[in-house]
């Protein structure tokens, strides 16, 4: 067995038999990781189940964060083979919704969002519902913005006199005069199809125009209505022509209010995401005919440690799984999707186009770099950040989220950290002329000490007074092996020391393939060192960030010194006991653990000593400390 404490051992991979991984099929499908209690902790999809699952176990030392912890808990795996990647995507989405596994990114369930439906019946109605049924109706949504949905409905109602009643308007019922017109007819909100005052053919013409409008085809709707208006005028049907003229004017005003965002008239969806700690928000801009039709947003949790690419893939896939109609010509993305996710999305879009019975076409996936298109991405990202901030504020008001520590926010800004450092770990060393060398690690979570996560290290490889070697050992032991699984990885590491200590820390993290921000804090003058700058800098004395770092450093120093003094005292006491002939080091340690101090051993009676160490040792001790009582 390798006794070297600096050996970079692989993280544990749970109790999953690896021969089970080797026997998995190479088919597309869904895999479920289970823990020792049989609970599903992660669900994923794959084009090739064996290759995807094997990737978790092939190089476990390259894993980090939540993935590393998850792999350490895998005890079993269950797979479901599907006929295609798209089928696997649909199944994965449904299973995640149902089971809500601990390590999956969870999007807010779309069953809470409303859809707009044009019913499949004579004289169709336009309704708002939260349940999608495959009954031949035409569906639009989901709408995450309730205000946007109300605005659309009000606008449609102001232009097109569509019925709002629940009557069964079959030709037989109408011809028998079964119904009478309601108030909507008298206030010009309905044309009275219930009494046969409007034919079904005329009514369906309005439905066609409404469908175009909901798809963002405002120009096509205006052209169609204009043609009909001119036709009525030629036939001297001036009342009908005037009615259409009013509708056209309203549509033109509506179109003018829509912001033009691209110089061409292509239909596009634009996606961006933002995340902070364990929450995220995805935003999609719906652009039709070059105009911004509206936006939707999807909120996520359990996002900590998940890459932007994976979050974006989750949002885009979920959006097109749930969205009815409105498929664009092109999709703009904040960043490239992982290759397999991109292929799955392309296949999903093809299947949706086929299911709608439309002509086969390719929807392009693009990451704009320059110009007005890149500006759209930037605008979408800013919206995602803004909505996420509002979402977090609301969570705080509801008591669902901790209010962020001002020092943490200041640290994130000053150090340009990728996220708020909600977990910070600080390391310090202590020794006396190279003896009793110890290190301490303290953890602050949400700006407060979490003493259950403190760790102390009795160093094993350091020779003499070598603080760099001490820092190398303690960081290696903390971030490799079982400790790396026991404790979550921090968002920031602080080492007590200057450039040399910081350089040592960076080397250790690089060797362990860990991407964790790290800084050094020099003693006394409070200078902060960062890896990519040669000169240190000072924080203002009033900065909450400086106050927090000082608390961390002082706590790590206190913890290290306390442990060092304890070891040194024990060693001194052990030396006194081991001068007694017949008392070895192990016996001395055992006695100190039992009594707590040499003074208590010195004053103990024979029976107490006998109970702790046996007859022979008790006699030796009593004779040593009570020589005058002999004879």
Curated annotation (Swiss-Prot):
Q: Which GO terms describe its molecular function?
A: DNA binding; excinuclease ABC activity
Q: What is its subcellular localisation? A: Cytoplasm
Q: Which domain of life is it from?
A: Bacteria
Q: Which residues form the UVR domain?
A: 219-254
Q: Name one Pfam family in it.
A: UVR
SUPFAM superfamilies in UniProt: C-terminal UvrC-binding domain of UvrB, GIY-YIG endonuclease, RuvA domain 2-like
Which cellular component terms (GO) are annotated to the entry? Answer: cytoplasm; excinuclease repair complex
Cytoplasm recorded as keyword: yes
Where would I find the GIY-YIG domain in this sequence? 26-105
Record-level GO BP terms: nucleotide-excision repair; SOS response
Principal location listed in the UniProt entry: cytoplasm
The UniProt keyword set, sorted, is: Cytoplasm, DNA damage, DNA excision, DNA repair, Excision nuclease, SOS response
Q: Does the keyword Cytoplasm apply?
A: yes
Return the PROSITE patterns for the record.
GIY_YIG, UVR, UVRC
Q: What does the protein in this record do?
A: The UvrABC repair system catalyzes the recognition and processing of DNA lesions. UvrC both incises the 5' and 3' sides of the lesion. The N-terminal half is responsible for the 3' incision and the C-terminal half is responsible for the 5' incision.
NCBIfam families, sorted: PRK00558.1-5, uvrC
Could you give the subunit structure recorded for this chain?
Interacts with UvrB in an incision complex.
Q: Which family does it belong to?
A: Belongs to the UvrC family.
- What protein name does the entry list? UvrABC system protein C
Organism (species) = Chlorobium phaeobacteroides (strain DSM 266 / SMG 266 / 2430)
């Amino acid at each position: 067995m390798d006794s070297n404490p600096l050996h970079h051992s692989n993280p544990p991979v749970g109790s999953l038999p690896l021969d089970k991984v080797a026997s998995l099929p190479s088919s597309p499908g869904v895999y479920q990781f289970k823990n020792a209690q049989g609970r599903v902790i992660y669900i994923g999809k794959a084009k090739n189940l064996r290759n995807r699952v094997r990737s978790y176990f092939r190089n476990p030392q390259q894993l980090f964060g939540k993935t590393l912890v998850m792999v350490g808990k895998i005890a079993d795996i269950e797979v479901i083979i599907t006929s295609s990647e798209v089928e696997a995507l649909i199944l994965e989405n449904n299973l995640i919704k149902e089971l809500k596994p601990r390590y999956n990114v969870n999007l807010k369930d779309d069953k809470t969002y409303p859809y707009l439906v044009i019913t499949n019946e004579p004289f169709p109605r336009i309704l708002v519902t939260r349940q999608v049924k495959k009954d031949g109706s035409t569906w639009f949504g989901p709408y995450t913005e309730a205000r946007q949905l109300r605005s659309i409905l009000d606008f449609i109602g102001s232009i097109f006199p569509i019925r709002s009643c629940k009557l069964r308007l079959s030709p037989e019922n109408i011809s028998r005069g079964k119904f009478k017109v309601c108030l909507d007819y008298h206030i010009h909100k309905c044309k009275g199809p219930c009494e046969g005052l409007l034919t079904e053919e005329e009514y369906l013409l309005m439905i066609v125009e409404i469908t175009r409008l909901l798809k963002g085809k405002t120009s096509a709707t205006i052209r169609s209505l204009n043609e009909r208006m001119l036709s009525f005028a030629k036939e001297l049907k001036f009342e009908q022509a005037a009615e259409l003229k009013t509708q056209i004017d309203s549509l033109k005003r509506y179109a003018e209010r829509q912001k033009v965002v691209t110089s061409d008239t292509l239909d596009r969806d634009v996606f961006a995401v933002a995340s902070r700690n364990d929450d995220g928000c995805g935003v999609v801009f719906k652009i039709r005919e070059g105009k911004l039709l509206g936006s939707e947003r999807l909120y996520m949790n359990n996002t900590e440690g998940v890459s932007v690419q994976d979050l974006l893939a989750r949002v885009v896939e979920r959006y097109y799984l749930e969205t009815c109609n409105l498929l664009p010509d092109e999709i703009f993305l904040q960043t490239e999707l992982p290759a397999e996710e991109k292929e799955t999305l392309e296949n999903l879009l093809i299947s949706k186009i086929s299911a709608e019975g439309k002509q086969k076409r390719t929807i392009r996936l693009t990451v704009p770099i320059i110009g007005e298109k890149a500006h759209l991405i930037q605008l979408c990202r800013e919206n995602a950040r803004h909505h996420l901030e509002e979402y977090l504020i609301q969570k705080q008001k509801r008591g669902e989220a901790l209010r962020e520590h001002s020092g943490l926010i200041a640290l994130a800004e000053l150090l340009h950290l990728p996220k708020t450092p909600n977990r910070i770990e600080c390391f310090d060393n202590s020794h006396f002329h190279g003896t009793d060398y110890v290190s301490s690690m303290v953890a602050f979570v949400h700006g407060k000490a979490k003493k259950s996560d403190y760790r102390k290290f009795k160093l094993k490889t350091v020779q003499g007074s070598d603080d760099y070697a001490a820092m190398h050992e303690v960081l290696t032991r903390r971030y490799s092996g079982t400790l790396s699984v026991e404790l979550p990885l921090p968002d920031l590491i602080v080492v007590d020391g200057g450039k040399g200590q910081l350089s040592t820390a960076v080397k250790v993290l690089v060797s362990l393939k860990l991407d964790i921000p790290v800084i050094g804090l020099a003693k006394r003058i409070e200078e902060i060192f960062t890896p990519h700058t040669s000169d240190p800098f000072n924080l203002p004395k009033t900065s909450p960030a400086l106050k927090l770092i000082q608390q961390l450093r002082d706590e790590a120093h206190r913890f290290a010194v306390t442990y060092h003094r304890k070891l040194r005292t024990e060693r001194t006491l052990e030396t006194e006991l081991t001068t007694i002939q017949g008392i070895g080091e192990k016996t001395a340690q055992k006695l100190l653990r039992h009594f707590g101090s040499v003074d208590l051993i010195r004053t103990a009676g024979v029976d107490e000593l006998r109970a702790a160490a046996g007859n022979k040792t008790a006699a030796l001790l009593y004779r040593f400390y009570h020589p005058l009582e002999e004879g």
